[in-house]
């Protein structure tokens, strides 16, 4: 698709956009917590694809490059607005997808969702981005390092400290039972 887009094939660019727009949008939304901003970032990302199409190495997968652009645009938006990462409802939904069998279980799951969301919100920006890319987007450490343009050791460190901070916050949350909290360790 990249080669065809380079040749001016608009349908190829449209196919490229349709293939990756959901992933780019979800990542931007998880970082910026604002639907309008996520939509703007999505558009800006694909404008960059179109304007830099000649610089993109078509022998490499496009998605890590797209995520790098998405994360950078999202980071710039957050920095300009002095906002923190937040929603991550997708992560929380993935963590609590078991069917509810009782009202008590439903209440416990709602409490767990709130506790996880608050714990994730309290992490610093760098740890949150790494956790989003690792758990929500399923990228490897090497891919995250490429996307963020940092050494793999930095990604491992942020992932380690992000998990540790998340675990500490969840274990210290009085709303969670010990049994539920230990599931996060």
Locate the predicted segments by residue:
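Short, charged helix-capping/linker segments at alpha-helix termini
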Residues: 4-15, 25-44, 55, 152, ...
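Helix-turn-helix DNA-binding module
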Residues: 36, 117-154, 168
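C-terminal edge and immediately downstream basic/flexible tail or linker adjoining helix-turn-helix-like DNA-binding
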Residues: 4, 86, 90, 115-118, ...
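C-terminal flanking helix
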Residues: 21, 25, 46, 124, ...
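Internal acidic/polar
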Residues: 84-113, 140, 183-185
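Arg/Lys-rich amphipathic alpha helix in sigma70-family domain 2
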Residues: 51-58, 68-89, 101, 109, ...
